[in-house]
Amino acid sequence: RNLRTDYLDMYLLHWRGSIPLEETVEAMEELVKKGKIRSWGVSNLDTSDMKELFSVPNGDHCQVDQVLYHLGSRGIEYDLMPWLEEHQTPVMAYCPLAQAGSLQRSLLKNKEVQKIAKVSGITPMQVLLAFVLRKDQVIAIPRSGRTEHVLQNWAVKDVILTDEEYGALDRAFPAPDHKTYLDIV
């Protein structure tokens, strides 16, 4: 009632918590059955959690895993992203522009990011977002406080970086070659 709607398009379990996944899935499926939600997903679940989720009845009804993902935080590329792709479950990347502060500044000032932005006629922020969106399975939810930024984010749908540009970004910010802890903000 407070939301002034009869249903939600998607309801996310934000943290794993102490409730067994089977009970969580049952509750989500009951909300779908009652028409309160159209779909459900999870947030901040790593590969082992997703495997466990998909092993419970209806766990494979999960529509998305929302995780931290940006050029400076690529740990999900090692095993979570391939697992989700194999199971046709999209990645919803939160903080795809690296939040704010010193990390974001260091990414934006990186010489490769700057060079690609200049050559492509886009902003360094758009380079960061284009990198995250290079795979079809990734949905990005960048924070935008100004109309100008919303429009710049929207324009990234038409940005196509070259293999050489992606390679330069990969060399500047390599994905891990081993399992890492899931980054969380």
Where do the language-model regions lie?
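Active-site groove signature of glycoside hydrolases
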Residues: 1-19
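Beta/alpha (TIM)-barrel catalytic core signal, keyed to glycine-rich beta->alpha loops juxtaposed to Asp/Glu
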Residues: 13-185
